């Protein structure tokens, strides 16, 4: 019997897969436990529409991420901070600070978890990588200057 999986089933496949299962397994276990539904023509059509909508949504998100990466490319974030001896900062500059500066300077909301940067403790120019989408990332300059 062909069934559409509604949840991941270890021995059969992932949610949304169209799989063959034995009649007894499907009727007595998968369907009653709402792990799968029978693959009628209508259900298969609905599944295909959902998959197409998800594919279009991912393409749209990818395009938006690429636009954002292009707009971020070459940007410089400047921090003016108080420093102590040997050019060391009081405290440090983290990805959270970089995220806040991007919002302040360029009005761009970027989650701090998407920013990959070492913790900055001295003045100088550094690079921070921003991973916008799994395949899309860009780098920005982080300048730390004495106040």
Swiss-Prot record:
Entry-linked Pfam families: Ribosomal_L9_C, Ribosomal_L9_N
Q: Which InterPro entries match?
A: Ribosomal_bL9, Ribosomal_bL9/RNase_H1_N, Ribosomal_bL9_bac/chp, Ribosomal_bL9_C, Ribosomal_bL9_C_sf, Ribosomal_bL9_N, Ribosomal_bL9_N_sf
Q: Does the keyword Calcium apply?
A: no
Q: NCBIfam families recorded for this chain?
A: L9
Gene Ontology CC annotations of this record: ribonucleoprotein complex; ribosome
> What organism is this sequence from?
Clostridium botulinum (strain ATCC 19397 / Type A)
Q: Which gene encodes it?
A: rplI
The GO annotation for biological process reads: translation
Q: Which family does it belong to?
A: Belongs to the bacterial ribosomal protein bL9 family.
Q: Which UniProt keywords apply?
A: Ribonucleoprotein, Ribosomal protein, RNA-binding, rRNA-binding
Entry GO MF terms? rRNA binding; structural constituent of ribosome
Q: What is this protein called?
A: Large ribosomal subunit protein bL9
- Its job: Binds to the 23S rRNA.
């Amino acid at each position: 019997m062909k069934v559409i999986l509604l949840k991941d089933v270890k021995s059969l496949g992932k949610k949304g897969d169209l799989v063959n299962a034995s009649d007894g397994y499907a009727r007595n276990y998968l369907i009653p436990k709402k792990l799968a539904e029978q693959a009628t023509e209508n259900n298969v059509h609905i599944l295909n529409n959902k998959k197409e909508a998800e594919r279009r949504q991912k393409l749209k998100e990818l395009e938006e991420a690429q636009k954002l990466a292009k707009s971020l490319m070459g940007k410089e974030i400047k921090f003016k901070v108080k420093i102590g001896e040997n050019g060391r900062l009081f405290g440090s500059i983290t990805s959270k600070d970089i995220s806040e500066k991007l919002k302040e300077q360029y009005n761009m909301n970027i989650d701090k978890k998407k920013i990959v940067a070492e913790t900055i403790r001295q003045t100088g120019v550094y690079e921070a990588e921003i991973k916008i989408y799994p395949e899309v990332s860009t780098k920005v300059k982080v300048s730390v200057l004495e106040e």
